[in-house]
Amino acid sequence: MTERTARNARAEAEAVAGTAARVLEPSPPTVTSEPWFADDPVALDGEDAVSPTSAGTRTWDDLAASDPAIAAFAQRHWLGNHKALPAVPADYVSSRDDFHRVAYGVISNARKAANGKFGLRYTAGGFGTPFFGDDEQVRVEGTELIVQRGDTVVAETLTTLARAAEVAGTVANADQAEHDTIELGDLDRALDIREDVGAFLGDWFGFGTSVLEEARLLATAPDDDLSRVQMWPGHFDPAFEMGSLEAGRRATYGASPGDGSHDEPYLYVASWGDIDRSNEYWNDDGFNGGSLSYAELLAADDPRALAQDFFRRGYDILHA
């Protein structure tokens, strides 16, 4: 194991920005209040803070425009000055699936043992838990499993599920699997953990979380019942829900890294109710909804604008 410096995403951002700031990642201290048992990293709570979304009066893009150091920091953390999406790595699926196994088979269990919650979040360079217990966080950055407990941080390259569980101080099991989740398999098998795929997933989850947090601002109806962005480990995708279930408007808005029906990442809107398949928006036969492919995002002059248009169209159709 190697030692690392403890992270506090919001404090790091505020030190760089020189003012109150919001981020896309969890920060300590541990939140023990229901229902989320987690912080909301973008919530302004009435404060005039620099924001990764258009909800505030100042964005990270505003600051990045005149300060190269801020621009570099914002880009690394998907807060602003956004870089182009990378190409999908060769032989992506096998390695992606093993990162998925780590997420649902190990990391989610560490959080669940502390407070009964198993939702994960985007963290810089990968994914991990919100803070729990005594300011603890378990996360993956690139190919490394990182365990932070207070000011103590250890890191180790991912090798097997059994070893990952040992380092994280938890058990490896399939308790968080969904009906379509890949099987966990042999806990002692050498995982296909690759640097290029780890970096790619970190970028995808950063991009996905950033466009989803912006899409949450679409919720304007009084009964939209907006949830937070979190990663369901069984599906391995950042997502949130909004819209009235009773009125047939509720849907999940998400950013999948790919699954059994999709080799590459995609954005999606999955309706909780009936949809009219004659509307070309509802184009995905893999689930009850519509998707926007990674190829379409790569081909776009402005992938972020295309993503927002896709989510907006879904919201408008459901609320028509």
What name fits each language-model region?
Residues A6-R139:
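N-terminal ordered "arm"
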Residues T2, A124, T152, R277:
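A domain-level signal for the structural core that forms small-molecule/cofactor-binding pockets
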Residues N115-E144, D224-W272:
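Amphipathic, interaction-prone secondary-structure segments
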Residues A103-A114, A168, G208, L212-A219, ...:
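Hydrophobic, Leu/Ile/Phe/Ala-enriched alpha-helical segments that form helix-helix packing faces
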Residues D276-A320:
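Long, compositionally biased interface segments
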Residues E136-I182:
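Hydrophobic, ordered structural segments
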Residues G80-N81, A87, E144-I146, A177-D196, ...:
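Glycine-rich, often proline-containing surface loops adjacent to acidic residues and nearby aromatics
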Residues A164-V229:
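Surface-exposed beta-loop interaction hotspot
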